[in-house]
UniProtKB/Swiss-Prot annotation:
PANTHER family linked to this entry: PHOTOSYSTEM I REACTION CENTER SUBUNIT XI, CHLOROPLASTIC
Gene behind this protein: psaL
Record-level GO cellular component terms: photosystem I reaction center; plasma membrane-derived thylakoid membrane
Entry's family note: Belongs to the PsaL family.
GO biological process: photosynthesis
Protein name (record): Photosystem I reaction center subunit XI
SUPFAM superfamilies reported in the protein's UniProt record: Photosystem I reaction center subunit XI, PsaL
Localization per record: Cellular thylakoid membrane
Major localisation: membrane
Amino acid sequence: MAETGYKQVVTPYNDDPFIGHLATPISASGFTKAFIGNLPAYRPGLAPILRGLEVGMAHGYFLGGPWVVLGPLRDSEYANIGGLIPALAMVLLATGCLASYGLVSFQGKAASNDPLKSAEGWSQFAAGFFIGGMGGAFVAYFLLENLGVVDGIMRGVFNQ
């Protein structure tokens, strides 16, 4: 049979099909590894409170959007505040879950070199998450409430 010249893109890890490793061109690429390595959970030398702050800001910022667009107040003038309040509630609930996870999982364990493997580290992470999440939700609310002004600034309307 003639060879078609087709090159298989997804191959077994180290050309051994019995290893069971699912390396794909996407998951094994340098870009993906660099992107995942720069997430706050994997960035070395970052204090737990700063990790929590960064994760919280991102979550607080995007949590309000679904309630603004799809919530029960979506067609009213109160849609933005109707997105802010549930986002704040979700951040508060997630903070409680993070804090209780840290208390339950690391109760009575010896101190570790990794700060996120201790109850104190998780407490700091949860505190940072709370501050960042609340701040992110309020920033998203502010931007939605003042969308006309922000749009004018971005378009350069006020600089003419």
